[in-house]
Amino acid sequence: MERKVLAFYYTWYGVPQVSGNWYHWEEGGHSPNDVNENGYPDFGTTNHPSHGPYDSNDPHAIRRHLKWSEEAGIDGLIATWWGQGQYHDKALKIVLNEAEKSPVKITVYYEVVPSSGVSGAVDDFKYLLKNYGKHPGFYTVDNRPVIFVYGRAMEQLNRDQWAEAMKQVKAEYDAVFIADTGSAELICLFDGGHTYNPVGLVANQVDMSQYYDDFTKKCRSVDKIACATVIPGYDDSNIGRKHVTMANRRGGELYKSLWAKAEKSAPDWMLITSFNEWHEGSEIEPSIEDGKLYLTLTRQLASKFKQR
């Protein structure tokens, strides 16, 4: 399988000039119209975007993100998705239309199962595949649309329910599903496995070389796509969480170290958490604090990974 690099992408941002309100920049009770003690707008972020706050429905911002992703050697962006007709669903349409003109394509991160359970998940997947699966901007493998499923959603259904959901969807659509789970019993129901965020492992000083190796072997043991996830750093201390988690970026050293360890496990795809999850300080999108450092590092590391 051809090696690919994808990054988790958030389409939940809004500014008054475009969407009429602030969306997500005020996360954690912040006030973007105010200035904080450091002289920056009071955003619910760890760092500050180099081009200022933006709106996920703004084609200009999307084009900038796609251009940066292309420069960094990223093949696809995994866009957060919370349900039919939601803010993120509207933004997805705009992002897909822009991705049609870019080599960087868009898939979705299925975040939550509706209260109706299996039938709701099946309905959501069919909605996504019917409305977006054939869009020229959608990310595919061998012409098969790809969907990632987040751990929260994974936990909302049991194994038998997921088996039934996959059976019903795949009877109608030839799609690829990548599950956020460490269970081989669950991975085998899907087309691959991944981890959204290894920050807990990093913070607890787990042997990441061993972790990546074990996870890749687990996916391969059931003949599925193996993904390895890297982070540039993490800091959710500015959004009012009771329990704060941090992983120091160390000027890019953490990122390079995780790439090297993940690469040794020979995964099929490398995933980056994240392109622009500003709340949790895991972004590689250019910031006032780091400039384009993480795009530059990603370009170097992605190129090396794809050449192995």
Name the predicted role of every residue range.
Residues 1-308:
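Glycan-processing catalytic domains of CAZymes
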